[in-house]
């Protein structure tokens, strides 16, 4: 994919502000990984994220300050949608974070 063919990133809800609140290292890593997705590549550390909507993926970031997640979907032709960005504080993803991402996915799907 050439630079002209990069997909735009669209931020759902407060996802951009949430990402900008990450510590510097985690924020830069998230930006780099989203750049990979824009180029049509896979992020370095990701997995499918079930229960939100078809095609939802999770970028996994770990730094000295904690564990961070960026939930996104790249299956739509027009853009990559960042659904939710958050710091993970427990072994499993909090239900509130899942509900935020699911509501944003549903809003995007209805467009």
Predicted regions and their residues:
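Basic, Lys/Arg-enriched alpha-helical interface segments
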Residues: 1-67, 76-79, 87-111
């Amino acid at each position: 994919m050439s630079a002209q063919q990069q997909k735009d990133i669209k931020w759902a809800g407060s996802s951009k502000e949430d990402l900008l609140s990450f510590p510097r290292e985690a924020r830069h890593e998230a930006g780099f990984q989203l750049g990979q997705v824009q180029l049509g590549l896979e992020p370095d550390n990701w997995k499918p994220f079930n229960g939100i909507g078809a095609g939802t993926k999770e970028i996994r970031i770990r730094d000295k300050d904690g564990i961070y997640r960026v939930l996104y979907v790249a299956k739509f032709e027009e853009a990559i949608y960042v659904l939710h960005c958050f710091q993970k504080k427990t072994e499993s993803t909090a239900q509130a974070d899942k509900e935020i991402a699911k509501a944003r996915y549903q809003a995007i799907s209805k467009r």
